[in-house]
Regions:
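Glycine-rich FAD pyrophosphate-binding loop
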Residues: 3-5, 19-42
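Short beta-strand to alpha-helix junction loop
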Residues: 93-115, 243-248
Length: 392
């Protein structure tokens, strides 16, 4: 058995790719997500559609049905006030893959998990809704591998599972890898503060399907239109910046928002009002880590068994790169296929770790170059935030 901890894009892509490449492998996908909870990370590039087709034609059919029903919104392009105070437009019509999407992220992730659960007629792939508690290695002569302890939602009971390979797709917390001795190396301390806005009875209809990006004195902003008359606004700054303290509360977040030129205009012109991100909650900013990080080591092959990390657990990207979700899914595909071939005993994948490490290093190196390039374009602001981001 292979156990994948994490039911987001990386974990689901790994499960679907593994199933596609080696249908005989028994896989358990452990998911602890709340499908009703709001989640940022809503931008899906247009070329991701090809990957969904590759992973599962049924998945892509369900996804396109959701698009037709308005569950996800088309992204018409980007408008950014970055290196200059003026907005510069990039239109999706010039993209050979077409328009990207602004997702209902919780619904998209659930669609992926449904595809994993529906890939087999028997019990080859199982999705378990529960929380990863701990992992133990066993080197007994009769069984060499891992014992994983899971607390099930609902009953609260603890189940145990055995696996030869573990895939850590648990996100930035890297729950499995860190229990096995790996460490997350953070190269910056970027935070993302986010608030959800909703249309009201007096709201002017919002036809702006762009992602609008705006650099500011101590960070940068973006806004994207979401389904059901909603809009997300996100502010990025370092955790030690004075504005981070302000952004943690609604009044401070809205005051900082008022200082923007374009983002505030989108909200004001359409009459949006701040709303809670969940039922029964007060409208206040959420906060999540958004900096660059990578896991050391990101994998380990113990010959008879092993583990590896994928997605944000292995390497997490600054949202400016717009690489997080698409790269997580691509790496999930690579990992799933590599594990499938390894378990078939193909001779060219004996050194699984070396092959995947080279791939991970290439991905991270390209990302760091691109991130440095984009931040270096901004020279109109001075101060600790921009000094921390420029490479010169």
């Amino acid at each position: 058995m292979i156990i994948i901890v994490g039911g987001g894009p990386a974990g689901c892509a790994a499960a679907l790719s593994l199933r596609k490449s080696n249908p005989d492998v028994t896989t358990l996908l452990l998911d602890d997500a709340d499908p009703a909870a709001f989640k940022i990370g809503e931008s899906l590039p247009a070329d991701a559609k090809n990957m969904l087709v590759y992973l599962s034609p049924t998945l892509y059919t369900d996804f396109t049905k959701d698009i037709a029903e308005g569950v996800h919104m088309p992204c018409s392009g980007n408008a950014s006030a970055w290196e200059t105070p003026d907005l510069r437009e990039t239109y999706a019509v010039s993209n050979p893959f077409g328009m990207g999407l602004h997702l209902d992220r919780a619904r998209f992730d659930q669609c992926l998990r449904d595809a994993v659960a529906g890939t087999t007629a028997g019990s080859q792939c199982t999705v378990v809704h529960g929380v990863f508690n701990k992992v133990e290695k066993t080197e007994a002569p009769e069984y060499q591998g891992w014992i994983v302890y899971v607390r099930r939602y609902g009953s609260g009971e603890t189940d145990t599972y055995r696996a030869k390979w573990l895939v850590d797709a648990s996100g930035r917390k890297a729950s499995v890898a860190r229990k096995l001795g790996a460490k997350t190396i953070k190269t910056d301390a970027l935070l993302a503060f986010h608030m959800l806005f909703s249309a009201t009875a007096s709201t002017q209809h919002d036809h702006d399907g762009r992602t609008v990006i705006e650099a500011a004195t101590a960070g940068w902003w973006y806004t994207a239109q979401l389904p059901r008359g909603r809009r997300v606004v996100v502010y990025h700054t370092n955790d030690d910046d004075a504005s981070a303290k302000l952004a943690r509360k609604q009044a401070g977040f809205l005051a900082l928002l008022d200082e923007t030129k374009y983002i505030s205009r989108v909200i004001a012109e359409h009459g949006y009002e701040a709303v809670a991100e969940g039922h029964g909650k007060e409208p206040r900013p959420g906060c999540t880590a958004a900096g660059s990080s990578h896991l050391v080591p990101p994998m380990e092959d113990r010959l008879t068994h092993g583990w590896l990390a994928v997605g944000d657990a292995a390497m997490a990207f600054d949202p400016l790169s717009s690489q997080g979700m698409i790269t997580a899914m691509k790496m999930g595909c690579v990992v799933g296929d590599a594990l499938a071939r390894r378990l078939r005993g193909e001779p060219d994948v004996e050194d699984l770790v070396s092959q995947l490490l080279r791939t991970y290093i290439r991905v991270r190196s390209r990302y760091e170059d691109e991130k440095g390039y984009f931040y270096d374009q901004v020279s109109r602001f001075t101060g600790p935030f921009w000094e921390s981001k420029t490479t010169a």
